[in-house]
Amino acid sequence: RCGENNCVGHDDLDVVFQFDKQGRILTQFGAGMFEWPHGIDVDDDGNVWVVDARGNEERGRGHQVIKFSPEGVVLLRLGTAGVAGRTRTTLDQPNDVLTAPNGDIFVADGHPGNGNNRIVKYASDGRYLMEWGETGSNPGEFRTPHALAMDDDGLLYVGDRSNRRIQVFEQDGTFVRDFYNMGRASGITIHNNKLYVADSESRYGSNPGFRRGIRVMDLDTGFVIAFIPDPDPTPGGTSAAEGVAVDNEGNVYGAEVGPRALRKHVAR
């Protein structure tokens, strides 16, 4: 996030970086385009989708999802730059984006607990298709839908962070089930039928009984089978991984906002 927790005043710093396995930078882009870069997804064609979770109308930035080519060329924008709203053409502090295998696009919209709290679905060309969700704690309702993932059956997983659960939906918004044993989900991903959840907020007074870190669930059983604790055990502000990814060798990567680091946890 431009060396801090947002990009305001840091227009010279790139936002997206591609590294090789040794950590060397291969590509970087996005300088001067974002207020608060938040969620990221890479589609099957290698295009990079980045969410800007805050906005400023005067600067004409934010409240958008931007699609880049692998080289950093802007291909598509969802939402109206700098304009917050809840319409077919506006977003308000979107959190995450996910592209389905058929090209459909899902956006988790609404960072505040009392915000938009909806999932918006678009066609691959950016046409609005549908949406579902409102503020609440019933099935299909949200309080900060912070992260998205999709399993091999095409089910959509939503990290409903302030409700301390994962909700699962069909792609038309039909509720399937939910989980309450994964903490406060800031980032989620699915690999080899395992659900990985980055919980950056469970700490003293915030989510009693849970610790910050990355939890791993076996989706066949619904049981948590592994836990990677936050490397920083102190109970201060958010420092643990907010984003999580897994490579083909099973190594787990945590995107840590506080330390401004990408930490690799090697599979054994």
Language-model features: locations:
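Eukaryotic scaffold repeat domains enriched in small/polar residues
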Residues: 1-268
